[in-house]
Curated annotation (Swiss-Prot):
Family: Belongs to the chaperonin (HSP60) family.
Oligomer and partners: Forms a cylinder of 14 subunits composed of two heptameric rings stacked back-to-back. Interacts with the co-chaperonin GroES.
Pfam family, one: Cpn60_TCP1
Enzyme Commission number(s) from the entry: 5.6.1.7
Catalytic activity: ATP + H2O + a folded polypeptide = ADP + phosphate + an unfolded polypeptide
One annotated GO molecular function: ATP-dependent protein folding chaperone
Amino acids binding ATP: T29, L30, G31, P32, D86, G87, T88, T89, T90, G413, N478, A479, A480, D494
Gene3D superfamilies: GroEL, GroEL-like equatorial domain, TCP-1-like chaperonin intermediate domain
Protein name: Chaperonin GroEL
Length: 541
């Protein structure tokens, strides 16, 4: 396939045009008075959103060289989203500013490699300044503010803060679409896993179709139970004690299941059987989690234990167990606190070591069930279009709060970059030649987020930047009220992780793009149209 090649300033100009087209589309969403972008979908209703990475992913340009530039910016947005979960629009705006400023200097004869070195030094200095300005998140109120700024909605902020407070940092918060118009928060206390009763005859409440066992014994095994004789001695002891039993096994089938159901219906004893959660090695780990949480033992051949030898003191205990068609929740397990703490730190260690995102997610879920809890935010809206937009904003808010808890917060609204630029200006004075020019590129780019926040509010960015520069650290411009205020006191906060990641990723891509001297793209070949009448005449067969 034939290729087209462009060199020097022509190649850079084409890439720069692609960067501008994508960045100009995304930057209209920045700030409290930012607008939305409507995205055409190949099926269903268009998507209306202000989420930078969602917009960036949709942009494909016709010109191959311009498209390469756009794809590079898309990488900045995606990488920032992966690391921090928010700040994608800021990262895009920073990249555009760096590319525009850098290209001017290259045309004036700057050396791109030395320029890049200066950009890297200035970025490191700015990141250091951002970290120095950071403060730890204090209380639920600040968490709510971080979420509200990210989503542009106070109600969302309060909901996310409630969820974070209830499940703690180890908990898992998931976001789902609601069946109603209301947005609500559901909290699952205790250990929940997605397996339900093996037979509806085991229900204790036929109206709700669920089985509730108070203070039950819990048999945990990775074996199949098909012969009732295997667990008969144990069942007799349970009946004598007048207790209830939850069986968690690989499966309960045949004669064993029939006998359990018949005795349940006769009222001989109250028993519920569920399948073990997970598969393979993950199943073994989850059964071990349940055993530690309830103070029982996993009856497994791996440990040399057989069902027929099981005694009552090998069983777990819990305050209550609720079993539905597809879920089981164990509340207040009777496990030893030290053993549970040991298991939690073991899972944390595995999370730190694993490189697989999938494994990390599953381990995080296990950690939440052991230590925190699981909260589900169900997002409701009048139409599907509004619901999808609200769900994206909710996800951004959740990611922003997690980032804030992790690395702390700083003044929001682009003002942190302005105050960090004072440190970069000091560095610029110590550099020489094109390194100095590279550092100045970053110095100029740090003004871009505040400039566009002001521009989207219909104000003159340059004037506002100068006023913020002259003010005390922590002071910034509140574009919603058009006032200069102490940003942290007024709840206009950004997570350091988001601010830092956006700057580092923008510099990484922009400095690499500026070192480009030639670009190669595939020439699109027009596919000839099918001649008229081709395919006709088949009826003659």
């Amino acid at each position: 396939m034939a290729k087209e090649i462009k060199y020097g300033s022509e190649a850079r100009a084409a890439l720069g045009a692609g960067v501008d087209k994508l960045a100009n589309t995304v930057r209209v969403t920045l700030g409290p008075k930012g607008r939305n972008v409507v995205l055409d979908k190949s099926y269903g209703a268009p998507l209306i959103t202000n989420d930078g990475v969602t917009i960036a992913k949709e942009v494909e340009l016709e010109d191959a060289f311009e498209n390469m530039g756009a794809q590079l910016v898309k990488e900045v947005a995606t990488k920032t989203n992966d690391v921090a979960g928010d700040g994608t629009t800021t990262a895009t705006v920073l990249t555009q500013a760096m590319v525009q400023e850098g290209m001017k200097n290259l045309e004036a004869g700057a050396n791109p490699i030395v320029l890049r070195r200066g950009m890297k030094k200035a970025t490191d200095k700015a990141v250091e300044a951002l970290k120095d300005m950071s403060q730890k998140v204090k209380g639920k109120e600040q968490i709510a503010k971080v979420a509200a700024i990210s989503a542009g909605d106070e109600e969302v902020g309060n909901l996310v803060a409630d969820a974070m407070e209830k499940v703690t940092n180890d908990g898992v918060i998931t976001i789902e679409e609601s069946k109603t118009m209301q947005t609500e928060l559901d909290l699952v206390e205790g250990m929940q896993f997605d397996r339900g009763y093996l037979s509806a005859y085991m229900c204790t409440d036929m109206d709700k179709m669920e089985a509730v066992l108070d203070d039950p014994y819990i048999l945990i095994t990775d074996k199949k139970i098909s012969n009732i004789q295997d667990i008969l001695p144990l069942l007799e002891k349970i009946v004598q004690a007048g207790a209830r039993l939850l069986i968690i096994a690989e499966d309960v089938e045949g004669e064993a299941l029939t006998t359990l159901i018949v005795n349940k219906l006769r009222g001989t004893f109250n028993v519920v059987a569920v399948k073990a959660p997970g598969y393979g090695d993950r199943r073994k780990a989850m059964l071990e989690d349940i055993a530690i949480l309830t103070g029982g033992q996993v009856i497994s051949s791996d440990l040399g234990l057989e069902l027929k030898d099981t005694t009552i003191d090998m069983l777990g205990r819990a305050k209550s167990v609720k079993v539905q068609k597809e879920n089981t929740v164990i509340v207040d397990g009777a496990g030893d606190k030290d053993a549970i703490a040991g298991r939690v730190s073991q899972i944390r260690g595995q999370i730190d070591e694993t490189t697989s995102e999938f494994d990390k997610e599953k381990l995080q879920e296990r950690l939440a069930k052991m230590a925190g809890g699981v909260a589900v935010i169900r997002v409701g809206a009048a139409t599907e279009t509004e619901m999808k937009e609200a769900k994206l904003r909710m996800e951004d808010a959740l990611n922003a709060t997690r980032a804030a808890v992790e690395e702390g917060i700083i003044a929001g609204g682009g003002s942190a970059y302005i105050h960090a630029s004072k440190k970069v200006a000091e560095l610029v004075d110590t550099l020489e030649g094109d390194e100095k020019t590279g550092a100045k590129v970053i110095l100029k780019a740090l003004e871009a987020p505040l400039y566009y926040i002001a521009a989207n509010a219909g104000l003159e960015g340059a004037v506002i930047i100068n006023k913020v520069k002259e003010s005390a650290p922590g002071t910034g411009f509140n574009a919603a009220t058009e006032e200069y205020v102490d940003m942290v006191d007024n709840g206009i906060l950004d997570p350091v992780k988001v601010t830092r990641s956006a700057l580092q990723n923008a510099t990484s891509v922009a400095s690499t793009l500026l070192t480009t001297e030639s670009a190669v793209a595939t020439i699109k070949e027009d596919t000839p149209a099918m001649p008229a009448g081709a395919g006709a005449g088949m009826g003659m067969m």
